[in-house]
């Protein structure tokens, strides 16, 4: 069954699951190499782990721009294919490539000229500043690897080929995991480079994944091809990409702002609290990768059938998507509740971190189901061409309510009660996202 027939005719449940499983696996592997980075860096020192946690907010901002642009492009391509306009899809894909290259150049310039300045803003301690600068400058200067990798993967996803998208991610992730201990600790004749080695291993993995994804598109993508000959740039393509992409960028950037602000709040508590939050955020991201894989699989299904005016299949996707995500999130809650100490020990947690982190993981994990519903509602509405619901839901759960509630609770009752801020933020965001997405669905499917 070809890509068009699969998106139009295959029963929704097996279609969603067969597309989602490769994406889940690839995203889990991608998240795993972030965790492996932290595990190896933690063996250097808690200071090195704190530096990696502080830099993560800036990395996340960079990734936000790439992922947001790619999500907008993915939604546009799926609709064009559903409308049976392959030439317009190819033109949009070419425009998307230029946008990715331009954006990566901007971040590379930031890495070359502003890494020192950013490091001084992230930390006051001179040792922390130096470690932050080492890790950050390499990731920014060579960011074109992650931008091209994200772009090429979304072209594959737009035509329903999540298996090759998965393989490209796995290639980069496995290479990163192999290179991490070699470059950090100086194995096999390689000089020990510490935090700098972790950053180099990361960008090499990203570049390898980008090359693989681009080659897969060149030889295995049956519909979408980048065509420079007779290419005509159209601002309408840019507008269509960022109609969904800009809210997604803002949504992702909110996560970056949140981690930066929360780290500043937690620095007033202790450096251990900052290191713990960095660990939690990567563990939580690992859990949410299956949720994100499910949501990313839904975008081309919803976008194609919306473009094809097959609204019944859009409704079926909605009815299957949310319960599946809730079950996955519930499994994560059980794991975090039952094994918090074991999870923290993966990162060589000190006794102080265990004392702080075990109750924190248990408290926060209660909100995972609500978080999953918010995320999936955002992906679903993005597939319908509405990125605002995604953006506002993310703003509520990660910034508007979480940050002030966390600050207030810590000031009033201490750090042990601060984690309850996650409950308030996730409940309100879940209610908003479900209501608005369901309302959008009813409007479209009248």
Give the positions of each predicted feature.
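Hydrophobic transmembrane alpha-helices of multi-pass small-molecule transporters
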Residues: 61-64, 176-181, 210-214, 286-289, ...
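Short runs within selected transmembrane alpha-helices of multi-pass transporters and secretion channels
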Residues: 70, 139-157, 165-173, 198-213, ...
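Transmembrane helical elements of multi-pass membrane transporters/channels
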Residues: 18-37, 138, 149, 172, ...
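N-terminal transmembrane alpha-helices
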Residues: 7-39, 43-44, 60-72, 76, ...
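Interfacial/gating helices of multi-pass transporter permease domains
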Residues: 18, 41-60, 127-131, 195-196, ...
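Small-residue-rich hydrophobic transmembrane alpha-helices
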Residues: 49-109, 146-165, 276-338, 371-393
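Short alpha-helical transmembrane segments in multi-pass integral membrane proteins
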Residues: 1-20, 77-144, 190-246, 302-367, ...
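Helix-terminus/linker motif at the lipid-water interface of multi-pass membrane proteins
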Residues: 28, 32-50, 119-126, 182-193, ...
């Amino acid at each position: 069954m070809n890509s068009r027939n699969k998106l139009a005719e295959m029963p929704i449940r097996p279609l969603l699951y067969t597309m989602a499983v490769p994406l889940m696996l690839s995203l889990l592997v991608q998240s795993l190499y972030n965790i492996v980075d932290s595990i190896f860096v933690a063996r250097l020192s808690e200071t090195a782990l704190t530096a990696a946690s502080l830099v993560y907010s800036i990395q996340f901002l960079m990734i936000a721009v790439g992922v947001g642009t790619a999500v907008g492009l993915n939604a546009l391509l799926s609709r064009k294919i559903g409308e049976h306009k392959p030439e317009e899809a190819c033109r949009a894909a070419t425009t998307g490539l230029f946008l990715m290259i331009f954006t990566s150049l901007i971040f590379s310039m930031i890495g070359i000229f502003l890494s020192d300045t950013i490091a001084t803003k992230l930390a006051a301690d001179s040792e922390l500043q130096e470690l932050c600068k080492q890790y950050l400058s390499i990731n920014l200067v060579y960011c074109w690897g992650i931008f091209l990798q994200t772009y090429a993967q979304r072209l594959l996803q737009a035509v329903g080929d999540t298996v090759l998208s998965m393989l490209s991610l796995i290639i980069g992730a496995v290479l990163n995991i192999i290179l991490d201990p070699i470059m950090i600790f100086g194995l096999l004749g390689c000089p020990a480079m510490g935090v700098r080695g972790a950053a180099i291993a990361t960008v090499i993995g990203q570049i390898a994944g980008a090359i693989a994804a681009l080659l897969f598109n060149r030889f295995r993508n049956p519909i979408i091809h980048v065509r420079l000959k007779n290419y005509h740039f159209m601002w309408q393509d840019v507008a269509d990409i960022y109609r969904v992409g800009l809210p997604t960028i803002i949504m992702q950037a909110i996560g970056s702002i949140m981690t930066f602000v929360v780290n500043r709040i937690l620095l007033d508590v202790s450096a251990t609290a900052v290191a713990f939050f960095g660990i939690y955020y990567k563990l939580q991201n690992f859990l949410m990768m299956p949720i994100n894989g499910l949501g990313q699989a839904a975008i081309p299904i919803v976008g194609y059938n919306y473009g094809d005016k097959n609204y019944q299949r859009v409704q079926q996707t909605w009815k299957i998507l949310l319960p599946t995500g809730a079950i996955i999130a519930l499994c994560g809650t059980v794991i975090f509740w039952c094994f918090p100490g074991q999870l923290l020990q993966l990162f060589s947690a000190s006794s102080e971190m265990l004392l702080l982190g075990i109750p924190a993981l248990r408290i926060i994990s209660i909100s995972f189901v609500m978080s999953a519903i918010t995320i999936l509602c955002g992906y679903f509405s993005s597939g319908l061409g509405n990125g605002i619901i995604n953006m506002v839901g993310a703003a509520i759960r990660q910034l508007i309510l979480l940050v002030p509630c966390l600050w207030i609770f810590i000031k009033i009752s201490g750090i042990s009660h601060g984690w309850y801020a996650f409950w308030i933020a996730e409940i309100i965001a879940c209610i908003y996202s479900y209501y608005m997405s369901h309302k959008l669905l009813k409007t479209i499917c009248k």
